[in-house]
Structure formats: structure tokens, C-alpha cells
Amino acid sequence: MQGDPEVLRLLNEQLTTQLTAINQYFLHSKMQDNWGFTELAEHTRAESFDEMRHAEAITDRILLLDGLPNYQRLFSLRIGQTLREQFEADLAIEYEVMDRLKPAIILCREKQDSTTATLFEQIVADEEKHIDYLETQLELMDKLGVELYSAQCVSRPPS
């Protein structure tokens, strides 16, 4: 099934964003684990896998529309050197995803591609949850202070 070239461009742009997020979250999770924040690392790793599922769905859609998924391009990774920097970097990429998705949904509807629009809407719903989580973590860090917040992210050894 031949897809609209503009819709295929938007799908590949969103694929690039998701592939970038996968790498950024995965590296952040490995760093968090290395720092001893194992519970936080597990959550961040799961977010990386959520982004992978988005990339898979976008890839499937591109292929169905007879397009070629571009896995060779990534946006710049923002790797935080502290938990706060990581949350801020992850939040920035989530805001960028939303800034790209909302006009893309409108264009897909204009092009009569409701399936791609629905896919993008599902991704928006997932990203809204992640934005809420990241904003909450930054608020907690501000309220508790970095040290107390960080202490909450460490797994307790089994007794």
C-alpha cells in the first residue's frame, strides 16, 4: 500500500526521535545502575523498552506504506552526568517528541491517514505518562533535596 510521502517523512522523523530516546534512556539506566540507583535504573530501562515498542510500531507502519525506515539517523543524545541532568535531558526529549507529534497528527488526519494518526495519538498518551513521571521526579528532588531523593532510589540489600 503506497503511503503519502509527507506521512512517510513524519513517520521517519518520529522513528528518529524514538531511536534517539531508546539510546539515551538505555545509557542513563546503565549509569544509574552503576551509581547504585538500581530501582531507578530498572524504571529507566523499562522506559527505553517502551520507546523500542514505539519504534517497532512506527517501523511496521512505514513498511506497510511501502516506505523505508531510516535506522541510520539519530538526533544528538543528551547524557546527564547527575540524576537531575538525566531527568532534565529525558524531559527535553519527551517535549520534543510531543512538539513533533501534535502537528503530525493533524497532517495525518488532513491526508486521510487515520491509522497513522491513531498510532501517533497512542504514542502521545504514553509520552504524557513519561512526562508526568519525569516532572514528578524533578519536583520530588526539589522538595526533598538531592541527597534524600537519591537515598530513595537505592535498592535495599536482601535481609
From Swiss-Prot:
Its cofactor is heme b. It comes from Mycobacterium avium. This is Bacterioferritin. Fe cation 1 binds at residues 51, 54, 127. It is an enzyme of class 1 (oxidoreductase). Keywords: Heme, Ion transport, Iron, Iron storage, Iron transport, Metal-binding, Oxidoreductase, Transport. Fe cation 2 binds at residues 51, 94, 127, 130. GO terms for molecular function: ferric iron binding; ferroxidase activity; heme binding.
